[in-house]
Amino acid sequence: EKKLRKYTYFKPLGILDTIYGLAENRDYIALKNEIIIFEGAKSVMLAASWGIYNTAALLTSHVNPYQLKILAKLGCRVVFALDKGINIREDENIKRLKRYVRVEYIWDKDDLLQEKDSPVDQGQEIWRTLYEGRLYYR
């Protein structure tokens, strides 16, 4: 007697093929024509407490091929606000992403953050300063 599998997985397991908060914030992202990408979910929640809803999180420090497709399909400006010390220019998938959408990023040139801080960790005023000084990734 041939036994059939109990479960069949049509998608590979163990991959991160989602962006935290995207589904909940899609309307705000469309309204602003911009998505701010954080590393962690906590930053998305903190930004929301300040009334900033066009945000989502990678849940890691780099963009994988699945997330690249998701961001490219959005067709809006992507602002990377990753933790201090993460250089987006070293990420091959972010380099690919700039072929499809405008990519900007937060860079703490004035040393306002502690090591490994998210751009929102030091409060709303510092976040605003960092966001207003964001750079265009050419």
Where are these regions (language model features)?
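Phosphate-handling DNA/RNA-contact segment within nucleic-acid enzymes
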Residues: 1-74, 92
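TOPRIM fold recognition
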Residues: 44-138
